[in-house]
A protein has these predicted regions:
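Pre-active-site segment of Zn-dependent metallo-hydrolases
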Residues: 38-78, 82-89, 112, 142-157, ...
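Zn-dependent metallo-beta-lactamase
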Residues: 2-42, 49-51, 251, 261-263
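Cap/insert and terminal regions of metallo-dependent hydrolase folds
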Residues: 70, 182-263
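Structural motif
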Residues: 41-43, 69-70, 131, 173-175, ...
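Divalent metal-coordination and catalytic microenvironments
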Residues: 35, 46, 75, 83, ...
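Active-site environment of divalent metal-dependent phosphoester hydrolases
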Residues: 51-52, 78-82, 102-105, 123-126, ...
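Short internal beta-strands
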Residues: 93-100, 226-231
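Metallo-beta-lactamase
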Residues: 28, 99-173, 248-267
Length: 267
């Protein structure tokens, strides 16, 4: 009897700490997301917001983001770096990225070294309490185009290798943000080893997977459970659509969740 009561008490304590183990995901368009974890940690991924044609105007006030604990940047292109510098300065958030790009950010003063987390593929890190992040491969390119704040002159700097991220929340839920990527064979390893619960996959084509390639990745490599299509429709070359993605998938076990920019999902 006492053992049973102890089990009930432990369940009540767990639920009080993380009510229903719920968490939220907000999409700003392109590849930009805000994750609010079960423990209240706020994580931004590729925060391209103020310059994003798909982000609703009401959400372009960066102050409205409130607390930010961590920013993850997949690679150095402007539509992924986005507002990283401003948000980091305003919030004091840690900023995690590949080690080489981290040096570029630090040396150019984009983000102070004291806020940077420079790491690399495979080895997991815990940048904030309760959140585990693993960097994985992405088939793309990376460079940092820096605009001098005084002269306005642009210069190009090393961006290291592009990446995707496996983000594991306090409740064990795993998100795979693929970054910008083409399809690659080791997606099979990502699916088998990390077993993501939710995948955020680019479908726009031209610079990344198109709907057919993304569908192949889902059905043949990742073994996806839930998929949110991203990185489409923001600029003219990104012609892939969720409808074409669904058609290319055919019969599949994956649940496709199509979000609207600004929308918040609760899991």
């Amino acid at each position: 009897m006492m053992r049973a009561l102890g089990g009930v008490l432990m369940l009540m304590i767990t639920c009080a700490a993380f009510p229903a183990l719920a968490w939220e995901l907000q999409w700003f368009g392109q590849s930009a997301f805000k994750v609010t974890s079960p423990g209240g940690k706020v994580i931004l991924i590729d925060p391209f917001i103020t310059g994003n044609p798909k982000t609703p105007e009401a959400l372009k006030d960066l102050a409205a983001l409130g607390r930010v604990d961590l920013i993850l940047v997949t690679h150095g292109h402007g539509d992924h770096v986005g507002d990283t510098a401003r948000i980091a300065a305003d919030s004091g958030a840690k900023v995690a990225m590949n080690a080489d790009m981290g040096h570029t950010f630090g040396n150019l003063g984009i983000v102070p070294y004291k806020q940077l987390i420079r790491f690399n593929k495979s080895g997991p890190i815990q940048p904030v309490e309760g959140i585990t992040v693993t960097m994985v491969h992405a088939e793309h390119s990376s460079e940092v185009v820096h605009t001098d704040p005084e002269s306005g002159a642009k210069s190009v700097h090393p961006g290291g290798e592009p990446a995707g991220y496996i983000v594991e929340l306090e409740n064990g839920f795993r998100i795979y943000h693929a970054g910008d990527t083409g399809v690659f064979a080791d997606m099979k390893f990502i699916g088998e080893y990390y077993r993501p619960d939710l995948e955020l996959l680019p479908i726009g084509g031209h610079f990344t997977m198109d709907p057919a390639h993304a569908a192949y990745a889902v059905n043949k490599l990742l073994g996806s459970r839930k998929v949110i299509p991203i990185h489409y429709g923001t600029f003219p070359p990104l012609k892939g659509t969720p409808e074409a993605f669904k058609q290319a998938l055919g019969e599949t076990r994956a649940e496709v969740i199509v979000m609207e920019p600004g929308q918040v999902l609760k899991f």
